[in-house]
Amino acid sequence: MRQTAALAERISRLSHALEHGLYERQHAIRLCLLAALSGESVFLLGPPGIAKSMIARRLKFAFRHANAFEYLMTRFSTPEEVFGPLSIQALKDEGRYQRLTAGYLPEAEIVFLDEIWKAGPAILNTLLTAINERRFRNGNSEDTIPMRLLVAASNELPEADGGLEALYDRMLIRLWLDRVQEKQNFRALLVNNSSERDNPVPPALSVSDEEYQQWQKDIEHIALPEAGFELIYTLRQQLDALEQAPYISDRRWKKALRLLQASAFFCGRDTITPVDIILLKDCLWHDQSTLTLIEHQLELLITEHAYQQKSLLFRLQQVNTKRQQYQREQSELQAFSVEKQGHFLGRKFHYALPDTIDTETLELVLQRPLILHDIEVNHLIIDKNALQGWLQKGGEIRGKLNGIGFTQRLDLLVDDRQHLAIRDISLQSSILSLPEKRDIALPAEITDEYEKLNMQLREQRRLFSQHQPCLFVPSEWLAKIEASLQQVAEQIQQSEQQD
């Protein structure tokens, strides 16, 4: 545990060093670092002049011994400019078709290719093999290439019918970048005189070749718990149900899982957590519209299912239903009842007030509020004699709504259990009771259910706290989870405190 915590601290410090002097690029640097540490590819989408190339150059400094290669593609770019020129001597003396790869992509650990979609088929096909297999065919031999990170950039997406989908699908992380927005960051950008060639990473933080190779093996041992799989599968089902959702290949899901494993590993954990799954927002989108869609679906996932928020609210609803049923039963026992008497002037029955009523006016409380005469009413004030007359003879009965203002016409009735009730304009009724009978103590069975919900919520909050910090997930996404858990807590508290 101490080793994993130390690694997480080291990677955090390494990331902060790489971020120095780059403004509003924290998330991009961190995800590019994660991609480099796990051997993945990144696509940066955005207008020219927003530090896309500088991000790639910075990542070279994350490694103790790393060569970098960068190239700006045009329609006229040739394979020789990317993969190295042909050896004239080998061709002349031995008849071998061999490239001189020193200083070119086949011998670079960090690769940056700008305006990637302008490259021709010869370059793109060779590049596809390099990404897939990390191998480069050079004449009669096939060599392993050391590429740890490919950063491809463009200010546009690949054309739908341009034959570029296979390469685009290999770029696991996709990031949209824009110009610096905040005033202070823009000022700092203008006055910053540091050189792009300066290495901001202390030697003790940079990654050795041996460490990198060992970490690739360690990442494979990070477990996907059943709960984590269920979250990923739920997201997949959510997306499959949407017509406008992008096509996501099984290969992309598989590669995305390894990225989640790497996130957990470099944050000092041995299993994938719901926090790591947030990274899927940068792996599954295809264009601007699906970026918004993926983020929305992922937000629903983490705020409803990641820490059992929806399940807790559903169970709270069940407890509240049970509580309401109990309160209805108790209210009926405590309802204001009248006494049935015989026939009177052609009416089948008439009623009388109980002899225990000795006040001139009655305050009667509604079992549940109703909208009467456009206001929400919780209780009534009715003249005793007027009520007695209505019980005897029927007709109109009036009372003060909530005990204030002029008297208003009331639609009272006596139900078949001889309880006095009131109806609204839609004929929804509420039983009336005397105020001293209003409070109904809840049985232990129901209060225990509320306590269980509180305990389960505390456990989910403990897990959420345990799953942090996560270097590669923006704080605003963690805040969404915290807000959803707080909402659950507030709803439980409101339910416990309601009358």
Curated annotation (Swiss-Prot):
Pfam families per the record? AAA_lid_8, ATPase_RavA_C, bpMoxR, LARA_dom
| This protein's record includes keyword Iron-sulfur | no
Give UniProt keywords alphabetically. Answer: ATP-binding, Chaperone, Cytoplasm, Hydrolase, Nucleotide-binding
An example GO CC term for this entry is: cytoplasm
Enzyme Commission number(s): 3.6.1.-
Q: Which InterPro entries match?
A: AAA+_ATPase, ATPase_RavA, ATPase_RavA_C, MoxR, P-loop_NTPase, RavA-like_AAA_lid, RavA_ATPases, RavA_LARA_dom
Question: What top-tier enzyme class does this entry carry?
Answer: hydrolase
At the top level, the lineage of the source is Bacteria
Q: Show the catalytic activity.
A: ATP + H2O = ADP + phosphate + H(+)
Q: Which residues bind ADP?
A: 23, 49-54, 196
Keyword Nucleotide-binding on this protein? yes
Report the locations given in the UniProt record. Answer: Cytoplasm
UniProt main location, coarse: cytoplasm
Q: How is its activity regulated?
A: ATPase activity is stimulated by ViaA.
* A molecular function (GO) term: ATP binding
* Database matches in SUPFAM superfamilies: P-loop containing nucleoside triphosphate hydrolases
Assembly, in brief, is:
Homohexamer. Interacts with ViaA.
Please report which protein family the annotation says this sequence is part of. Belongs to the RavA family.
* Job description of the protein: Component of the RavA-ViaA chaperone complex, which may act on the membrane to optimize the function of some of the respiratory chains. RavA functions as an ATPase.
Which protein is depicted? Regulatory ATPase RavA
* Organism per entry: Pectobacterium carotovorum subsp. carotovorum (strain PC1)
Name the gene: ravA
